[in-house]
């Protein structure tokens, strides 16, 4: 019986360990959680550009969109679990399943949703809101202040929203009736979000089919100020927003 040379055996062990690590990472990404980062300000102030999160895939069960590249020859959801109003979800657009989108669930199947005079109404009742301190940010190098409110959804979920003082086209909408097996989603920055208020033909989200949900956003594991630069090492540590790491609501 011949033994493998020690160097050959060592390289084989390393390759095997790397392969097992890759398989484990793929398995976790496929079955448990999907990493996701925020590319736009539509969910401010809850989620900021530069936030990195994990979306729990088992929260709602599994669909073909739970798999990488939306592969899979089945429809609907396996081990389906209910979606709660107020959940922050990652989903795929029916017209373009390549990208990931993140919004908050506002309307459940059968709900009537409308925005009138800038106030959200669900099933004919205005949602309670209360003004709090303005949200401060930077835009084009200049400080910005945006009116911020706390909104309380039916069921008791409280979360912050932004709403610019001036009324826009998204502040007065028709009444939407959420179809069976679909959800109505909105961004927390109500004046800066192409969401279910906007038809798909106009670049919006429209209603989101249940099978297009990828997962629920539960945890933020990293947050980096987008103003940091590789060329300026002095900004590296300052760019890490440690206070934002943790649960997402």
Predicted regions and their residues:
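Soluble "head" domains of membrane/secretory-pathway proteins
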Residues: 2-12, 27, 31-37, 42-249
């Amino acid at each position: 019986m011949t033994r493998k040379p020690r160097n050959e055996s060592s390289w084989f062990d390393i390759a095997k360990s790397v392969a097992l690590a890759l398989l484990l990472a793929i398995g976790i990404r496929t079955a448990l959680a999907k990493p996701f980062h925020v590319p736009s300000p539509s969910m401010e102030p809850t989620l900021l550009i530069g936030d990195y999160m994990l979306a729990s895939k088992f929260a709602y069960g599994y669909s073909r969109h739970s798999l990488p590249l939306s592969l899979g020859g089945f429809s609907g959801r396996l081990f389906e679990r209910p979606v709660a109003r107020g959940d922050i979800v990652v989903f795929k657009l029916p017209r373009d399943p390549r990208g990931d989108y993140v919004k908050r669930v506002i309307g459940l199947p059968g709900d009537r949703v409308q925005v009138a005079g800038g106030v959200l109404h669900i099933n004919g009742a205005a949602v309670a809101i209360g003004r709090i301190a303005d949200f401060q940010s930077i835009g084009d190098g200049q400080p910005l202040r945006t009116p911020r409110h706390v909104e309380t959804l039916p069921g008791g979920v409280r979360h912050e929203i932004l709403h610019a003082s001036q009324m826009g086209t998204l502040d007065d909408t028709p009444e939407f009736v959420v179809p069976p097996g679909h959800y109505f989603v909105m961004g927390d920055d109500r004046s800066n979000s192409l969401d279910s208020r906007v038809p798909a033909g106009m670049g919006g989200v429209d209603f989101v089919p249940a099978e297009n949900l990828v997962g629920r956003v539960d945890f933020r594991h990293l947050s980096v100020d987008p103003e940091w630069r590789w060329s300026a090492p002095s900004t590296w540590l300052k760019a890490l927003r440690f206070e934002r790491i943790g649960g997402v609501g």
